[in-house]
Amino acid sequence: MRNQLYLMADDIAQTARETFPGAQTHLIGGDSRERHDIIEDNSVDLSFTSPPYLNNYDYADRTRLETYFWGEAKSWSDITKKVRNKLIMSATTQAIRSGFDKDHAMSDELCSVAPCVAKMLQNKVSQLVALRMVKGGKKSYDLMVAGYFNDMLPVLREAYRVLKPGAAFVLIMGDSAPYGVHIPTDIYLGEIGVAIGFTRYEIEDLRVRGGKWKNNPQRHSVILKESILTLFKN
């Protein structure tokens, strides 16, 4: 997996050399939720990413072929320790119920920075807590939703720190509706971004999602979408 990452970095570097002679690329391995002092304040012209979609997709499991092949993992628990536990929360397979306070699911930091959003999210989590008790499978969507936004807050904060005034943070993402409870991910993250310090945000809808499941009787009826969220820093 590490070799593949370096191959991708080489491709980017080659493209940069051919398109922008003299340009340099630097690969920084790290967690986007953490501060990286190598990137100075107000030094970045553009930040562009697509964070995990809040759709219970186990991104860690998608590394199974590579981690097994390279001998970095031999079991589900190995992948959990080495990959799954390190990712931004986006799947119920990452959720740990022990110690979870369903009435205070949102982090203290999120409640302090964006109390209105935190209150709306707490309401969504409470709905999911109740639905979990009557639904088959008892999926931990409540933990998933709370964990996702708690994890994304420091990502937004760090992006704001490193971006230059006048720069933008662009995110491609999808909304979610676990157990039919709609989570407008782009709006919530946009509002959190403004609470952090971004001046404003714009949302551009790209496409409708989930159409292939429309004939599934167990599927919710919420129409989902993929969108571009752009946060502007002045």
What feature does the model see in each segment?
Residues 153-165, 193:
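A short glycine-rich, Lys/Arg-flanked "PGG" loop and its adjoining helix->strand segment in the class I
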Residues 54-157:
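SAM-dependent methyltransferase catalytic-core segment centered on the flexible catalytic loop
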